[in-house]
């Protein structure tokens, strides 16, 4: 079945099974690669299923994030991103982004990345996006989030390897540059909005992402 027929009420975005990237033969890998490439070229967004990430891990990640955001504000601010040398940590509601329509934003975040040791040469050289993460003192938080980061990063590399094939690029043309990625994992907590909310208060201001590939994990729960 072609991806054009695998849509539902979520804005008509294509739903693509990537099982063939993990377990298929060369022909199946090519088919999925072409489906991903076509969706990326024609729409710019697509959804995937059969990604291979344990659903229990995904649920544990949501729970870990919820436990952090439920902490008192003073506790969360101990991990404030402004205290970090490499853009890691808590981003409070009051932090305003460089978006024209983001006057009173209604979300908070926690930013992480590839967890490198504090003696990493790039970190010591002042690289502002590489280095150690800031970890809240919550039981199991580091272990769960670290595992999720590694698995979602591996999925991103797999999708990029498929796009290499679709674009006719040599194997590794993209993925060979991902050995020490600056990939960011952002845990987000959105405040539930009323239908009559003031339009100056937004969940997320209009913006574009700078990454090669953005992966968004959708949660059924409000916020």
Task: Give, region by region, the residue ranges found by the protein language model.
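Peripheral, non-catalytic segments flanking oxidoreductase cores
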Residues: 1-223
């Amino acid at each position: 079945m072609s991806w054009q027929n695998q849509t539902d009420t979520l804005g008509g975005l294509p739903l693509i099974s990537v099982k063939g990237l993990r377990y298929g033969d060369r022909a199946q890998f090519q088919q999925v690669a072409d489906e991903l490439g076509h969706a990326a070229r024609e729409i710019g967004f697509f959804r995937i299923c059969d990604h291979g990430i344990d659903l229990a891990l995904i649920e544990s990640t949501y729970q870990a994030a919820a436990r952090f955001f439920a902490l008192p504000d003073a506790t969360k601010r101990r991990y404030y991103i402004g205290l970090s040398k490499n853009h890691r940590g808590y981003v409070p509601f009051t932090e305003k982004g460089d978006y024209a329509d983001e006057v009173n934003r209604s979300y908070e975040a926690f930013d992480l990345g590839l967890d490198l040791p504090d003696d990493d040469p790039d970190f010591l050289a002042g690289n502002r996006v590489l280095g150690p993460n800031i970890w809240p003192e919550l039981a199991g938080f580091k272990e769960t989030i670290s595992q999720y980061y590694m698995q979602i990063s591996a999925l991103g590399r797999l999708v990029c390897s498929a796009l290499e094939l679709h674009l006719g690029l040599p194997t590794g043309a993209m993925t060979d540059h991902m050995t020490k990625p600056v990939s960011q994992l952002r845990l987000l907590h959105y405040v539930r909005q009323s239908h009559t909310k003031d339009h100056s208060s937004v969940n997320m201001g209009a913006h574009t992402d700078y990454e090669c590939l953005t992966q968004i994990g959708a949660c059924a729960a409000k916020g």
